[in-house]
Amino acid sequence: MVNLLSCLLLFLLSLHCFVACLAVNTKNITTDQSALLAFKSLITSDPYDILSKNWSTSSFVCNWVGVTCDERHGRVHSLILRNMSLKGIVSPNLGNLSFFVILDIKNNSFGGQFPIEVCRLRRLKVLHISYNKFEGGIPAALGDLSQLQYLYLGANNFTGFIPESIGNLQWLKELDTSNNRLSGPIPQTISNMSSLEVLKLFSNYFSGSGGGGGEEEDEEEK
């Protein structure tokens, strides 16, 4: 009888833990869904109706076009929306996607300033926003993305300096700031980036030795 009671209590405790974990996961994925819906709400042109028809609360967020979820945690892992002719600004709510690893919106028409809130995503490894219309300065807070390995900012309208904090990205393998309107000296802190393999800085207005330099490649843009 005692053993039966112990087993029953253990079962109830396990059931309670399961329900509690399920509730937490549901709340977290709802947070991710809300962040992506906020992103969608700031898109002013979706000529192929990709998001307007697919991104809906009637379907599971992990099944949305361009969205991938992490199998282990069940959270939004990546957003890849390249070459879709989307126009608008990027919602700061993307900074709530705490399990985000990849943000790739290459070759669209996103504009305005890039939201500093994205720099809260400490798991981010790939940030690809080339071939858009972003303007203003490159956020110094990008230097807080300690896991970042690939940073592509090329072919936008960024102005000002490359922030010194860029040198904090110890795991960065590729950096592209080409074809912008950046000026001033190239920060010496770039030499601290021990993992850097590809550096593209050309077609800017840098001053001093090496301005507009970097390794230029003939291969197709990534």
Where are these regions (language model features)?
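Plant-biased, solvent-exposed loop and capping regions
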Residues: 1-222
